[in-house]
Regions:
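Residues that define the transmembrane beta-barrel architecture of outer-membrane proteins
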Residues: 8, 31-35, 84-88, 109-111, ...
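Predominantly the C-terminal beta-signal and adjacent terminal strand-loop region
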Residues: 85, 147-209
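Outer-membrane beta-barrel domain signature
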Residues: 18, 24, 37-38, 43, ...
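Outer-membrane beta-barrel translocator domains and adjoining extracellular loop/strand segments
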Residues: 24-29, 64-70, 103-107, 126-132, ...
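Gram-negative (and chloroplast) outer-membrane scaffold detector with strong preference
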Residues: 47-128, 196
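Outer-membrane beta-barrel strand-turn architecture
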Residues: 6, 43-47, 96-98, 144-148, ...
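Residues on the lipid-exposed face of transmembrane beta-strands in outer-membrane beta-barrel proteins
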Residues: 14-18, 39-43, 90-94, 117-121, ...
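Short glycine/proline- and aromatic-enriched beta-strand/turn motifs that initiate or cap beta-hairpins
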Residues: 2-44, 191-201
């Protein structure tokens, strides 16, 4: 039979979660979690694929006292930081199964896992200097279709930055490095989001051929 619910091209919403720095002064991927907020927009190509634009705002922190590595400069006076981070990311998301209510696209599932990857920009406001750099976001997530227009999302994303100074310190080992991601700082985000779907596609395009 014909599908009853329309598919939607666009989503807009917001989310909350945590942000964690991973670098020279924190070796634990889940250590020193800080609160974060997000704005989210999506363009849905079809029930499998979409493009997401997100803006995140949060904090990153770390300390040389919390790692086992010996840093000559901080042997007597440990270094610590607490910086503000803002980023913008454009990522491609691929759902493992078609996403929808099941009444908009034949075979669609309300709950689907997905993978994501893309490009982003990161700005960090430090105590002594600010850093602006690119990042490469890679992650996994899941979406749940509450109803025709309301969506819940959960995503865990790793952001591989091109800078070693998100923490305010460059080369604390006194060892020069080379390569695009060699000894650079990273951060991760875990976000729960709510989005609203709008801009319906033509219903007749959603029928099974």
């Amino acid at each position: 039979r014909a599908q009853d619910d329309p598919q939607y091209r666009l989503e807009i919403g917001a989310g909350v979660g945590v942000m964690t720095y991973e670098g020279d002064f924190n070796g634990n991927v889940l250590g020193d979690m800080q609160p974060a907020g997000f704005l989210v927009g999506r363009y849905n190509f079809d029930p499998y694929k979409d493009l997401k634009l997100s803006v995140g705002f949060g904090k990153i922190k770390g300390s040389s006292a919390n790692v086992d590595t010996f840093y000559p400069d901080y042997a007597e006076n440990p270094y610590s930081f607490n910086h503000t981070l803002v980023d913008m990311n454009l990522v491609f998301e691929y759902n493992f199964w078609p996403y929808g209510t099941g009444r908009d696209y034949r075979g669609a599932q309300r709950l689907v896992p997905y993978i994501l990857g893309g490009l982003g920009a990161t700005y960090v406001k430090g105590n002594e200097k600010n850093v602006f750099t690119a990042n490469v976001p890679l992650g996994i997530g899941a979406k749940y279709k509450v109803n025709e227009r309301l969506n819940l999302g959960l995503a865990w994303t790793f952001h591989f930055s091109l800078s070693d100074e998100l923490d305010g310190v460059k080369d604390p080992y006194w060892v020069k490095s080379s390569g695009i991601f060699k000894n650079t700082d990273c951060y991760s985000t875990i976000a729960v989001s709510v989005t609203y779907s709008f801009s319906a596609k033509c219903k007749t395009c959603n029928k099974e051929e």
